């Protein structure tokens, strides 16, 4: 359907308030509906209301905002918000990431990581990286070693995500054994890594 416009803060909040399960919510994630940093003013306003005493009075640690890394905007978010941060990496090698994600050409993953190293993620705020594992694309030992080198010194975690086949898309996911091997290698080399529970296979 493509991009149609950015939601104002009120509409972002209404997406939450209108959920039938709103009273049972424990966490909120800004992910999968466009790039939050491209609508930063409204995202910051919405998270401010969610965490303010006059709003929901939630702790910022119950909210995660995802980003591919947008120059200047990510820095502003890190300075003005205490919410958790999830960075969509998907490939640690810049030239390959640019093929998967054109945003790499704007603010590369190496620049993103260098920026993140200026902030403290050892206490309440958590930093995570999202990584969809594609067969024969980003699942090799070369990629695992590049991840370890790239995030060295960062207090972070990695979430490996299974890819489910999409019609007419040539990309493929890997089997469970490969996912576990990739996870174990990263974990053994100091990068805390989990495999996200899959809800999309059906």
Model-inferred region functions:
Residues 1-10:
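Canonical Radical SAM [4Fe-4S] cluster-binding loop centered on the CxxxCxxC motif
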Residues 11-189, 194:
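Conserved AdoMet/S-adenosylmethionine-binding subsite of the radical SAM
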């Amino acid at each position: 359907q493509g991009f149609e416009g950015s939601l104002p803060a009120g509409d972002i909040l209404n997406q939450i308030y209108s959920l039938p399960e709103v009273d049972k919510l424990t966490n909120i994630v800004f992910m999968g509906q466009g790039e939050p940093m491209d609508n930063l003013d409204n995202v910051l306003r919405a998270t401010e209301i969610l965490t303010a005493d006059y709003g929901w009075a939630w702790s910022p640690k119950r909210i995660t905002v995802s980003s591919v890394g947008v120059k200047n905007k990510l820095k502003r978010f890190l300075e003005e918000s205490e919410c958790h941060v999830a960075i969509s990496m998907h490939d640690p090698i810049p030239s390959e990431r640019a093929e998967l994600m054109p945003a790499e050409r704007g603010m590369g993953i190496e620049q993103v990581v260098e920026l993140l190293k200026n902030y403290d993620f050892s206490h309440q705020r958590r930093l995570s990286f999202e990584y969809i594992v594609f067969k024969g694309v980003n699942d090799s030992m070369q990629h695992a070693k590049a991840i370890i080198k790239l995030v060295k010194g960062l207090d972070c975690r990695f979430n490996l995500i299974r890819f489910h086949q999409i019609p007419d898309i040539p990309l493929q996911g890997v089997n469970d054994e490969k996912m576990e091997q990739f996870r174990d290698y990263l974990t053994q080399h100091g990068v805390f890594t989990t495999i996200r529970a899959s809800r999309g296979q059906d």
